[in-house]
Amino acid sequence: MLQPGNYSLVLSLQFLLLLFDLFVNSFSELLRDPPVNQLVLFILQDVGILFAAIVLFLMLFNTFVFQAGLVSLLCQRFQVTVILCAVYIALSISLHVWLMNLRWTGANRFVWSDGLLALFVLQRFVAVLYFYYYKRTALSMGDSRFYHDSLWLRKEFARVRG
């Protein structure tokens, strides 16, 4: 079970990962002069997003609800967050690969095509949704109902079985 001291540590880690992701999204265009700098930032950002998703899944798997077999309840409750995690990592990797492909050969020339600009805007829009839902899910995972047997859980179990 997740203890209160451990929860605050995990929550701090999750917020730190979100803050780093926000930093890279905000300032990666300013740090592009040698392309290798931007490449390292993009790799660290993608690894951070994957690590944040792993931490989120570990928190979901650690709940009493999951251990009681009500996986469908967790999936229903946090479905949007899980889908946004997958979409956001796919958009981020796509944008990073496209940008690095264009910038590696000519770092000082204009590389913004219409498709790249559309992908950039879409990735930034999904990033806002991802940040909101991820933070909301991370904070709601602190609810004590998820970590011990309760009347709410028994009612949900009866509803699923009946």
From Swiss-Prot:
Q: Which residues form a coiled coil?
A: none
Query: Can you tell me where the transmembrane regions are?
Result: 7-27, 41-61, 80-100, 110-130
Q: Cross-referenced InterPro entries, in alphabetical order?
A: TM_138
Function text: Required for ciliogenesis.
Q: How does it sit in the membrane?
A: Multi-pass membrane protein
Q: Which UniProt keywords apply?
A: Cell projection, Cilium, Cilium biogenesis/degradation, Glycoprotein, Membrane, Transmembrane, Transmembrane helix, Vacuole
Quote the PANTHER family the UniProt record gives.
TRANSMEMBRANE PROTEIN 138
Family note: Belongs to the TMEM138 family.
**Cellular component, GO, one term:** cilium
BP-aspect Gene Ontology terms: cilium assembly
The keyword Transferase belongs to this UniProt entry's keyword annotation: no
Q: Which gene encodes it?
A: tmem138
Where it sits in the cell: the answer is: Vacuole membrane; Cell projection, Cilium
Protein name as it appears in the record: Transmembrane protein 138
Please report the organism this UniProt entry assigns to the protein. Xenopus tropicalis (Western clawed frog)
Where mainly found? membrane
Which residues does the annotation flag as glycosylated?
6
Q: Which domain of life is it from?
A: Eukaryota
- Name the Pfam families on file: TMEM138
